[in-house]
A protein has these predicted regions:
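Proline-aspartate-enriched helix->loop->beta-strand connector
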Residues: 80, 84-86
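Short His-centered aromatic/hydrophobic patch
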Residues: 90-96, 115
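Active-site charged/polar residues at nucleotide-handling catalytic sites that mediate phosphoryl
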Residues: 50, 83, 106
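Active-site proximal beta-strand in glycosyltransferases
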Residues: 3-5, 104-120
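N-terminal strand-loop element at the rim of the active site
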Residues: 5-68
Length: 139
């Protein structure tokens, strides 16, 4: 059996979009910890009900503040070293970037990214923030 850390952007997606995956992992006997930016009592109750631990993270999904991003990375490194997962699966852009970096820094060998859609970075807008983010994500 594996220990698995799932890192997502928002807690609701853990239930709505990844719920069946989490249930399947648990039914196969894997230890699963799920984390995302923010708290949601319904999601936490659902995850507890299927045997998944939930950790709320300090994630500002659309912020470009490097200090907040470093705090997010620091918390991910602490969580990854504490849980010592065999596998890390991250989805959404910031969790992928910082989650997989934290996993690598913590010595996790199996690191996986899941990016769906184009997201905020590629939405129609001419703002400087979006152009910078689009360039970074495309790199």
């Amino acid at each position: 059996m594996y220990s698995v850390l799932i890192i997502g952007g928002g807690p609701r997606t853990l239930m709505d979009l990844r719920g069946r995956l989490l249930e399947s992992m648990r039914s196969r006997g894997h230890d699963v910890v799920a984390c995302a930016g923010g708290e949601d009592d319904d999601v936490e109750a659902y995850l507890r009900g299927i045997g998944v631990d939930y950790v709320s993270l300090p994630l500002e999904r659309t912020s470009l503040n490097p200090i907040l991003d470093l705090l997010f990375l620091r918390r991910l490194v602490m969580l990854t070293r504490e849980f010592q997962p065999d596998v890390v699966l991250a989805y959404n852009v910031k969790p992928v970037i910082y989650g997989l970096l934290a996993a690598r820094m913590s010595g996790v060998q199996r690191r996986y990214a899941l990016i769906t859609g184009l997201g905020y970075a590629f939405s129609a807008s001419a703002s400087i923030k979006k152009r910078l983010l689009s360039g970074l994500v495309s790199y």
